[in-house]
Swiss-Prot record:
ANK repeats lie at residues 34-63, 68-97, 101-131, 135-164, 168-197, 201-230, 234-263, 267-296, 300-329, 334-363, 367-396, 400-429, 433-462, 466-495, 499-528. This is Ankyrin repeat, PH and SEC7 domain containing protein secG. One of its GO terms (cellular component) is cytosol. GO terms for biological process: actin cytoskeleton organization; cell-substrate adhesion; chemotaxis; chemotaxis to cAMP; culmination involved in sorocarp development; regulation of ARF protein signal transduction. Residues 784-895 form the PH domain. Disulfide bonds: none annotated. The lineage of its organism: Eukaryota, Amoebozoa, Evosea, Eumycetozoa, Dictyostelia. Keywords: ANK repeat, Repeat. Gene3D superfamilies: 1.10.220.20, Ankyrin repeat-containing domain (1.25.40.20), Arf Nucleotide-binding Site Opener,domain 2 (1.10.1000.11), Pleckstrin-homology domain (PH domain)/Phosphotyrosine-binding domain (PTB) (2.30.29.30). Residues 29-43, 920-929 have a biased composition (Polar residues). It comes from Dictyostelium discoideum (Social amoeba). PANTHER family: ANKYRIN REPEAT CONTAINING, ANKYRIN REPEAT DOMAIN-CONTAINING PROTEIN 16.
């Protein structure tokens, strides 16, 4: 969704060619001793006297490298000390030596505009003006972005190539246009730099200047023959860039020079869509004055009004409706109106405005959901109350028979649930699967919602179409608190569904020992558990409470005379084996069970650990020690647990970090050590608590540090480094954060001052070149992975080859964009599949079925799972051995499963249960080159697995950025939770 996010690049590779990390000056404070060889320090400070004394009176070489392979000449060139540069050249310093990024001293001097140093290096040092760094960036690239016109002119006169391209295909003119220096632009064009040059993404210098808001450069480029309407690979024009970034002058110039005000990118997005999404009323008005059409729709059917309403831009919506009131009920491709979007996001003022403009309050989208369903699903009680007060029927149903109360109960929105009940919602209304709101709340373990419903009179023993009660669902889900509530309100302990199973059967089958105990103590009939479940009991209860198990076995032996001898022998052997277990082995088994319980439900796991004596008492220090000393524990579960805000969890977090030793560690080393102990949770507040404690511990352990004024600076920088790490090493992020952006993002964090530049630049280099490896446990669905690796897959409708991360697990082949992703792009069940090696394509095999289409599904661009349009899949490996290995593994997993349709439906319902909103995202352009900061904003995107900082990138329209990561999560208010409940009992 949303092609508009990638019009210009955030310098993934360009940055490393155009800017270089400043060499550390070593002495961060006047009283501190240099941490690097003093020859580098004296070179960087321009202290020619001490530098000459050192080199003349010692065996120190003028080419002595530091840890980044930078010599004194690099440092002197960067800091602009012509005297030191001249002296070092006299001492025969190598002027062509390169640092770890491939930069010569000339690149350093050029990036800072030190003309005298440039002249010395070229004329005295003999450096080639076209020398290239590791990304093919030349000194002219560096000077064009940051330096003065005099430096550019000197390099050009020295035969610097004005058409040189980086590995991203960018010329010096691209950089000068992004930097906004019209004199540099004119010099480069005069030197025959192509004014319409395109980089690897078809981005031109005009794209760069427009996005950065450099109207003088835009004017000059157009005057020199730049095409006014070039398109990048996403169909994005300079006008899109200027509009999304909010530059009126650039917009006006482009339109005056002939650009179509209603130009569209490959997804039908116009400049007006951008300004409305961003809430820029001034530019919205100007675009309309220039002829922009307010009723144009993108490929998702969304109008500018949809964009403005989704983000709550009230003034923009009022202006659009003033011009055309008939837009109020325009529907997008999913039949959603602006009121659906505003209600979904809980934008009370926007909902009120749209209702005042006569929006249809009961209008339904393609899933039969009304705005009230949307508001209820996300728990926006104020919006729900307003909609009801304005006439929305409280018991209106969607296409699956669900009312707004079903939605609130399913998603655990207790406040909204209470609001709907007070407004007259019916408690016993059933959806198409016979489920009541209480079924929904019980299925997802929302005990607070269950309590509210039961106190208001909901039938605790209501049955759905499968005759399952809420207690069946809660027991199968392992929701102990909910089970307690249901029993408290007199739920039938031994109710049987149509399968003849009681809640206890499901608790045992799912290994929910705590729930099983609650049911047994409440009087559950043990005879309802089949004899085969003795093994399940042992697995469920571990090795404790043997008497309970023996009672079950003995009772069954006396009452069931048809038990065969083998079963009796097995039970007797199991009993004898348990009696012979040594105490240590029992403890090991307990620990294993405790770990499994914790990995499934962290809080219940801790209760299990305490209740069964794994630790002596519920003491924060003991719990923290347990979490740190058992490697089998899920790092994700540890992160979720210690990140919770409850008092005890906070105490555990503090005890957990207190066990970690950061004494004498560099900042990045300490952070790496910390992040190896758990997996960062997705919720921002949890991360905040964890980083705050890390900052405190690191600062206390390093009282002699000369970098940080207080622990607040450590805290902010820790966040920033995590974002940088994700940005630098996530293959999905093509526009990487530059060093200049990293420094700019962290300016003033040290009690109002900047952290030392050499420290920050060195830190940037460490993170970019050496990824912080964060522990992860993998997707829950992929815990038993048979095979995984990179393969190349051919698309369905569009026959392109794309690299994907494949996982073979549970008779399914799943593929992801990256190994870090939580949700697969597609699922290929290996049911009745044939594997054939394709002799026409190298190392390629084909998956196909005797049916017309394979029973596979893929993740749509809006986050929903849909039927894939594949008669066959073509997949290529890197070599013959790898292909043979995959083919053999896949063949061994092919099976026949008549229930696949139900499985696919279950997965689709689950995805929709997370929700889907019908609007298409717009993301602002990302600046290609880091230069003097244009008036952009920095948006932080957090992901379950990743945190990303991008320049000028707003949240997606139509999606909600998840707190973990890098990918937007969309929501639907019209899932079928009871269908999910049914499959949960299978």
């Amino acid at each position: 969704m949303g092609s508009t996010s990638n019009s210009t690049k955030n310098t993934g590779s360009t940055t490393t060619t155009t800017t270089t990390a400043a060499p550390a000056t070593t002495a961060k404070h006047s009283n501190s001793a240099p941490t690097r060889p003093s020859v580098h320090y004296y070179s960087s400070t321009g202290d020619i006297e001490k530098l000459s004394n050192l080199l003349n009176n010692s065996a120190t070489s003028p080419d002595t490298p530091d840890s980044e392979k930078r010599t004194p000449l690099h440092h002197a060139a960067f800091c602009g000390s012509a005297a030191c540069v001249n002296f070092l050249l006299d001492k025969k310093a190598n002027a062509n030596i390169k640092d770890s990024a491939g930069n010569t001293p000339l690149q350093w001097a050029s990036s800072r505009g030190h003309l005298e140093c440039i002249k010395l290096l070229v004329e005295k040092g003999g450096v080639d003006v076209n020398t290239k760094d590791d990304k093919n960036g030349t000194p002219l690239h560096k000077a064009s972005l940051f330096a003065s016109a005099e430096c550019v002119l000197y390099l050009l006169n020295g035969k610097a190539d004005p058409r040189a391209v980086t590995t991203n295909g960018e010329t010096p003119l691209h950089h000068a246009s992004a930097g906004g220096n019209p004199q540099c632009v004119e010099l480069l064009i005069k030197a025959d730099s192509k004014v319409n040059a395109v980089d690897n993404d078809c981005i031109t210098p005009l794209h760069q200047a427009s996005f950065s808001g450099h109207s003088s450069c835009v004017s000059l480029l157009l005057k020199k023959g730049a095409k006014v309407d070039p398109r990048d690979i996403h169909g994005i024009s300079p006008l899109h860039n200027a509009a999304s970034a909010g530059y009126v002058d650039c917009v006006e110039q482009l339109v005056r020079n002939g650009e179509n005000i209603n130009c569209v990118d490959i997804e039908g997005v116009t400049p007006l869509h951008h300004t409305c999404f961003n809430g820029n009323l001034q530019l919205t008005k100007r675009l309309i004055e220039l002829g922009a059409k307010i009723n144009m729709v993108d490929e998702m059917g969304e109008t500018p009004l949809h964009k403005a309403a989704f983000n709550g831009h009230k003034e923009v919506c009022e202006y659009l409706l003033y011009l055309d009131p008939t837009m109020i009920d325009c529907r997008d491709s999913r039949q959603s109106t602006s009121l659906h979007l505003a209600a979904f996001n809980g934008l009370l003022d926007m909902v009120d405005l749209l209702i005042r403009y006569k929006a249809q309050i009961n209008i339904k989208d393609e899933e039969g959901a009304t705005p009230l369903h949307k508001a209820s699903f996300n728990g926006h009680s104020s919006c729900a109350k307003l909609l009801v007060d304005k006439g929305a029927p409280i018991c209106i149903v969607d296409s699956q028979g669900a009312t707004p109360l079903h939605k609130a109960a399913f998603n655990g929105r207790s406040k909204c649930l209470a609001t709907l009940i007070r407004s007259g919602a019916e408690l016993e209304v059933k959806d198409s699967q016979g489920g009541t709101p209480l079924h929904n709340a019980a299925y997802n373990g929302h005990s607070d919602c269950c309590r509210i419903l039961l106190k208001k009179g909901a039938n605790v023993n209501a049955v759905d179409t499968h005759s399952s009660t809420p207690l069946h669902l809660a027991s199968a889900a392992g929701a102990r608190d909910t089970v307690d509530v249901l029993i408290q309100f007199k739920a039938r302990i031994d109710a049987k569904n149509f399968a003849g199973k009681t809640p206890l059967v499901y608790a045992i089958k799912k290994n929910h020992s705590d729930v099983a105990r609650v049911l047994i103590r409440a009087g559950a009939d043990l005879d309802q558990v089949s004899l085969r479940s003795s093994v399940d009991f042992t697995k469920t209860f571990g090795t404790e409470n043997h008497d309970e198990i023996y009672q079950i076995v003995n009772k069954r032996e006396s009452s069931n005379h048809e038990v065969d001898e083998l079963q009796l022998a097995l039970e007797q052997q199991a009993k004898e084996d348990m009696e012979q277990l040594a105490a240590e082995k029992q403890k090991l088994l307990l620990i294993k069970a405790a770990i499994a319980q914790f990995n499934s439900h962290p809080k219940k796991g801790i209760e299990f650990i305490v209740a069964n004596g794994v630790i002596s008492e519920k003491n924060p220090k003991e719990v923290a020690h347990f979490l740190l000393t058992h490697s089998e524990l899920s790092k994700q579960s540890i992160g979720e647990y210690i990140g919770e805000g409850d008092d005890f969890n906070l105490q555990v977090l503090h005890a957990f970090v207190d066990e970690l030793n950061f004494f004498g560690l560099d900042f990045d080393v300490a952070l790496r050590k910390y992040l190896l102990t758990f997996r960062l949770p997705g919720e921002a507040q949890k991360i905040d608590r964890m980083m705050e404690k890390f900052a405190s511990q690191f600062y206390q352990h390093n009282p002699e540090n000369k970098v940080f004024v207080n622990q607040d600076a450590v805290y902010v920088l820790a966040f920033s480094v995590i974002m940088l790490n994700t940005d630098a090493h996530n293959p999905n992020i093509k526009k990487k954060m530059t060093k200049a952006e990293f420094l700019r993002n962290n300016s003033g964090i040290n009690s109002g001052d900047d952290l030392p530049p050499d420290f920050m630049e060195n830190l940037y280099d460490k993170i970019v070149t050496n990824e912080i490896k964060m522990e992860r446990d993998g997707n829950q669905a992929n815990q038993h992975v048979e095979k995984k690796g990179w393969l190349t897959k051919q698309g369905g409708r569009i026959k392109t080859w794309k690299k994907r991360w494949f996982i073979l697990t549970a008779n399914c082949l799943l593929y992801y964009k990256t190994p870090q992703d939580h949700e697969p792009c597609g699922i290929i069940p290996l049911e009745n599949v044939v594997v054939t090696i394709d002799p026409q394509k190298k190392f390629c095999f084909m998956l196909h079925s005797s049916q017309e289409q394979m029973k596979a599904c893929k993740l749509n661009s809006d986050g929903t799972l849909v039927q894939a349009n594949h008669a066959a899949y073509f997949i290529a490996a890197a070599n013959m051995a790898e292909m043979d290995s995959w083919v053999q593994s896949i063949k061994s997993n092919i099976h026949s499963n008549p229930n696949f349709e139900q499985l696919l439906k279950r997965k689709a319902e689950t995805i929709r249960g997370r929700g889907k909103v019908s609007t298409k995202p717009i993301q602002n352009r990302k600046q290609t080159i880091s230069g003097p900061p244009p008036s952009t904003t920095t948006t932080t995107t957090s992901t379950a697995s990743n945190n990303v900082t991008s320049v000028g990138s707003p949240p997606n329209s139509g999606s909600v950025l998840n707190s973990s990561g890098s990918k937007p999560v969309t929501f639907s208010s019209t899932s079928s939770p009871v269908q999910q409940q049914t499959s949960a009992l299978s």
